[in-house]
Curated annotation (Swiss-Prot):
GO molecular function: aspartate-tRNA ligase activity; ATP binding; nucleic acid binding
Family, as annotated: Belongs to the class-II aminoacyl-tRNA synthetase family. Type 1 subfamily.
Principal location class: cytoplasm
Record's keyword annotation contains Signal: no
Keyword Protein biosynthesis: yes
Gene name as annotated: aspS
Protein name: Aspartate--tRNA ligase
List of residues binding ATP: R219, D220, E221, Q228, E482, G534, L535, D536, R537
Recorded catalytic activity of this chain's protein: tRNA(Asp) + L-aspartate + ATP = L-aspartyl-tRNA(Asp) + AMP + diphosphate
EC number of the protein: 6.1.1.12
Length: 591
């Protein structure tokens, strides 16, 4: 039906007859000549219809937005005054000789030009229209190029594309599972995989050595802008490779990806320990474009007569950190109050501050409600450590270390945006040496997952001091977004059982939930390691989209619903009976 894509017609085709198909992007009658912008996935081309062909001209006059049409015509150069350098096809136009309406279009329920006025609900309900917008189409085309590159790279480096099951068994991986009832085993359920973690480890135990898969994963969790109930991972696992070798291979893939698709050289990725990232940036995924850093000042404040500072300064689990913002002395009291409310979202109970108005004036040049609690030497040392200058403001976070990290880390990001401090376009890094466990509610939880190997300890040493253990794990971070995370896996049955016990999973529960894994570990398991990238986040970053929904063809809403298909929906009652399932009525709300 066509000879060329609309966006591919160029000066080399001048004089040629072309056949194009696509949608009417815009049609306008200018002095008896009709100009038609025809659009397909590759772009736009201008088609001109003269009244010399009255039958064709009449058809062109009847066109409205989003009619699906076929055009036949001859390519010609545009007059110099009409060349459009903003269009890929802006040097040429097609003189229309024939026109066929393939399918008419009703008036649209949403605007494809002024899409900012469309609600998110409408965009998802009429997703097939929203995806016609060039911006959306180009993102999905770019996504296809990313997956094509990944497959070529993986294939070229000896990795095998192997599928793993979608119907599997529920395992504790941090989020709720989507459950699928079994008809043949009434009362029992499959789970949709949160990741192929255990199956890819079993593939290493099976001897396949290098595996990858671009795979759907499912998590029934509360949604945010960067979360979806179903998402896509670039999943990788290797045998007989160290963590450094896995990082080298996957870093090379991402660097080559950016170079090929965006002509961007990311350079070598620096490595930073988890401790350093949390201390300097208050985050395990720091945005290095932001030059602001947290500075520890607790040692200066242990003896001050201000409990807000001295309390955390003398608490083993506490921290007092300072954050200097260049030019921040211009902030009004209301703006400071707004920042105080902002850090309160992250658990902070307040936000002390100090404006540096005139260093030459000594203490008199400092403006702060807490200055009266600090002697001149302390103030001078705080200014020296933070490298504050005239016109700066210093904010203080004082609380438990985790609260300070989260609240001041968030303030660092917000201030960096508000004061337009971000430097450079792309700043990747590796974050390594994560804690093996974190403690909450009197028990230990795995920071990554229960199959991550500790670094440099025996099973006995791990069990004796789990809170001190460091995992052989690594996260790739780009511009404050975790692109992917991985680790060396446990390949020893005793170590795996020890980790289960530390996590409160006794031998009986471990056998019931992970018996197949523990069995497999008895038969010559190779050392193995891997990593998984979030494809949606990667494409979101590379295309500059504001949400992963804008790089997915048919995403869900923030309430995990699909307005297009009205999913989820009610099941057929007969099917529920066959499955042995009864739906309980909603309990009435208690007054």
């Amino acid at each position: 039906m066509r000879s060329h894509y609309c966006g591919d017609v160029n000066k080399s085709h001048v004089g040629q007859e072309v056949t194009l198909v696509g949608w009417v992007n815009r049609s306008r009658d200018l002095g008896g000549v009709i100009f038609l912008d025809l659009r397909d996935r590759e772009g736009l081309v201008q088609v001109v219809y003269d009244p010399d062909l009255p039958d064709v001209f009449d058809v062109a006059s009847s066109l409205r937005a989003e009619f699906c049409v076929q055009v036949k015509g001859v390519v010609r150069p545009r007059p110099d005054s009409q060349v459009n350098s903003q269009m890929k096809t802006g040097e040429i136009e097609v003189l229309g000789k024939a026109l066929t309406i393939i399918n008419a279009a009703d008036p649209l329920p949403l605007s494809l030009d002024n899409h900012q006025n469309n609600s998110e609900e409408a965009r998802l309900k009429y997703r097939y229209l929203d995806l016609r917008r060039p911006e959306m189409a180009q993102r999905l085309i770019f996504r296809a190029k990313v997956t094509s590159f990944v497959r070529r790279f993986m294939d070229g480096n000896g990795f095998l594309d192997i599928e793993t099951p979608i119907l599997t068994k529920a395992t504790p991986e941090g989020a709720r599972d989507y459950l699928v009832p079994s008809r043949t085993y009434k009362g029992q359920f499959f789970a949709l995989p949160q990741s192929p973690q255990l199956f890819k480890q079993l593939l290493m135990m099976s001897g396949f050595d290098r595996y990858y898969q671009i795979v759907k994963c499912f998590r029934d969790e509360d949604l945010r802008a960067d979360r979806q109930p179903e998402f896509t991972q670039i999943d990788i696992e290797t045998s007989f490779m160290t963590s450094d070798q896995v990082m080298e291979t996957t870093e090379r893939m991402i660097r080559n990806l950016f170079l090929e698709l965006m002509n961007v050289d990311l350079g070598d990725f620096p490595k930073m320990t988890w401790d350093e990232a949390m201390r300097r940036f208050g985050s395990d995924k720091p945005d290095l474009r932001n030059p602001l850093e947290l500075v520890d000042v607790a040692d200066l404040l242990k003896a001050v007569e201000f409990a807000v500072f001295s309390g955390p300064a003398n608490d083993e689990e506490g921290r007092v950190a300072a954050l200097r913002i260049p030019g921040g002395a211009e902030l009004s009291r209301k703006q400071i109050d707004d920042y105080t409310k902002f850090v309160g979202i992250y658990g902070a109970r307040g936000l002390a501050w100090m404006k540096v108005n005139n260093l030459a004036a000594g203490v008199e040049g400092i403006q702060s409600p807490v200055a009266k609690f600090l002697n001149e030497d302390i103030i001078k040392e705080i200014i020296a450590r933070t490298k504050a200058a005239d016109g700066d403001i210093i904010f203080f976070g004082a609380d438990k270390a985790n609260v300070v990290a989260e609240s001041m880390g968030a303030l660092r990001l917000k201030a960096g945006e508000d004061f337009k401090l971000l430097e450079g376009e792309w700043r990747p890094l590796w974050v390594v040496d994560f804690p093996m466990f974190e403690k909450a509610d009197g028990r230990f939880y795995a920071v990554h997952h229960p199959f991550t190997a500790p670094r440099g300890v025996t099973a006995a040493e791990l069990e004796a001091s789990p809170g001190k253990a460091v995992s052989d794990a690594y996260d790739m971070v780009l511009n404050g977004v975790e692109l992917g995370g991985g680790s060396v896996r446990i390949h020893n049955g005793d170590m795996q059982s020890t980790v289960f016990r530390i996590l409160g999973i006794d031998d009986e529960e471990a056998k019931e939930k992970f018996g197949f894994l523990l069995d497999a570990l008895r038969f010559g398991t190779p050392p193995h390691a891997g990593l998984a990238f979030g494809l949606d986040r990667l494409v979101m970053l590379m295309t500059g989209a504001s949400s992963i929904r804008d790089v997915m063809a048919f995403p869900k809403t923030t309430t995990a619903a699909c307005p297009l298909t009205n999913a989820p929906g009610h099941a057929n009652p007969d099917q529920l009976v066959e499955l042995g399932i009864a739906v309980l009525p909603k309990e009435p709300k208690q007054d």
